[in-house]
């Protein structure tokens, strides 16, 4: 088995259905699909049971668990420990593959034998338009995590060893890839669009202050003598952004976000 696609969810039945349909529509079948549900009470478990026969008919191994957990990253770690495939991809509730043949196209490329992380591009969806983020362009500026987790595949052995640090609220993925990069794990870029996800309402987009504050921890700035100054700078630069955006008319907020993402098309 080559790929383990993992979805984590909690009380997000409608978003979950969207992701289930996307995975089920893949023309690539050398994979398993794992869903880790946090004990939902909105009918998500009944939905998962209804899809079991559909995945079986497609020839895709399908397993799910529904139990209380300690949050998103705990669920993602559980999924990794369940995985039997060579590569892990996290496609969480509401996320989708870009095309029905995404996995076929992606894995038709030559994967280097020493690559530990393989990643592609992402279609980001906003209220005001969509656009393709080509992550090759970000490699020089951000060699640690120049992609979103939906568009990358990590060796299962690495995920099971490193795991997500659950002390982070929203940047445990950044921390994990920082550790992988620091330890010399090889990244490989493939010029294919892998995933589509909503870039407007994600945790990082709506929590810029927490994003930067936790980022200081990742880079161990919190252990330096100048940490109070760095923290003050973060608060001065980012502390006002979300409150200000909340007070802005939506058209102005969208225009500002679009200006920062020039690849977005109406």
Predicted regions and their residues:
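Membrane-proximal basic amphipathic "stem/tether" segments
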Residues: 220-266
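Catalytic core of nucleotide-sugar-dependent glycosyltransferases
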Residues: 193, 205-229
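Nucleotide-sugar donor-binding/catalytic module of glycosyltransferases
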Residues: 1-205
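Short alpha-helix boundary/capping motifs
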Residues: 187, 208, 243-247
């Amino acid at each position: 088995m080559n790929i383990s696609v993992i979805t984590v969810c909690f009380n997000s039945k409608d978003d979950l259905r969207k992701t289930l349909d996307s995975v089920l529509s893949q023309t690539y079948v050398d994979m398993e699909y794992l869903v880790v549900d946090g004990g939902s009470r909105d009918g998500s478990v009944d939905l998962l049971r209804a899809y079991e026969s559909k995945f079986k008919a497609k020839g895709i191994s399908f397993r799910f668990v529904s139990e209380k957990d300690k949050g998103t990253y705990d669920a993602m770690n559980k999924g990794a420990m369940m995985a039997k495939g060579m590569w892990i991809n996290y496609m969480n509730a509401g996320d989708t593959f870009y095309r029905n043949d995404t996995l076929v196209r992606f894995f038709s490329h030559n994967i280097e034998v020493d690559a530990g992380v393989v990643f592609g591009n992402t279609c980001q969806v906003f209220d005001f338009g969509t656009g393709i983020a080509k992550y090759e362009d970000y490699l020089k500026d951000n060699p640690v995590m120049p992609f979103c987790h939906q568009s990358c595949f990590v060796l299962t052995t690495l995920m099971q060893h490193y795991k997500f640090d659950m002390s982070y609220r929203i940047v445990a993925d950044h921390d994990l890839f920082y550790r992988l990069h620091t330890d010399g794990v090889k990244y490989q870029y493939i010029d294919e669009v892998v995933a589509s996800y909503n870039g407007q309402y994600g945790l990082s987009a709506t929590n810029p202050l927490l994003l930067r504050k936790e980022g200081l921890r990742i880079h161990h700035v919190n252990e330096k003598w100048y940490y109070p100054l760095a923290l003050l700078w973060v608060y001065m630069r980012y502390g006002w952004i979300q409150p200000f955006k909340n007070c802005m008319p939506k058209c102005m907020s969208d225009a500002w976000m679009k200006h920062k993402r020039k690849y977005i098309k109406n």
